[in-house]
Design a protein with these regions (language model features):
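Acidic catalytic/metal-coordinating carboxylates
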Residues: 36-39, 62-65
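Conserved acidic segment of CheY-like receiver
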Residues: 2-14, 18-22
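Active-site beta3 strand of CheY-like receiver
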Residues: 47-53
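Short hydrophobic/Thr-rich beta-strand motif most characteristic of the beta2 strand and flanking loop
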Residues: 27-35, 43
Length: 106
């Protein structure tokens, strides 16, 4: 059974590249893509993936705000943060809110 994934990133090339990599692996199914935090939260109301790949720096609602909303609404999803931010403060905030992994885009 494939792991259901949602990709949330404001860059369409990043979303498309991640989708292609995951689908080539074969054990993953990208069930949704979101271009910002608000879009992500709307799509989470429709269906909950097993894993959410989440960018931090996005317009309208950033990834840390999405993390807090997910925690507040008690949405059961594993979250991997993908970001260019390598500053410790972002990692600590994300870990404090509750993430399952933190990957740098470098």
């Amino acid at each position: 059974m494939a792991v259901k994934v949602m990709i949330t990133d404001d860059h369409s090339l990043i979303r498309e590249g991640l989708k292609q990599l995951l689908e080539l692996e074969g054990d993953f199914q990208v069930i949704a893509e979101a271009c910002d935090g608000i879009d992500c939260m709307e799509k989470l109301k429709e269906q909950i993936p097993d894993v959410l790949l989440l960018d931090i720096n996005m317009p309208r609602m950033n990834g840390l705000e999405v993390l807090q909303k997910i925690k507040d609404e008690k949405i059961d999803v594993k979250i991997l943060v993908l970001t260019v931010h390598n500053e410790v403060e972002y990692l600590l905030k994300a870990v404090d809110i509750g993430i399952n992994g933190y990957l740098l885009k470098d």
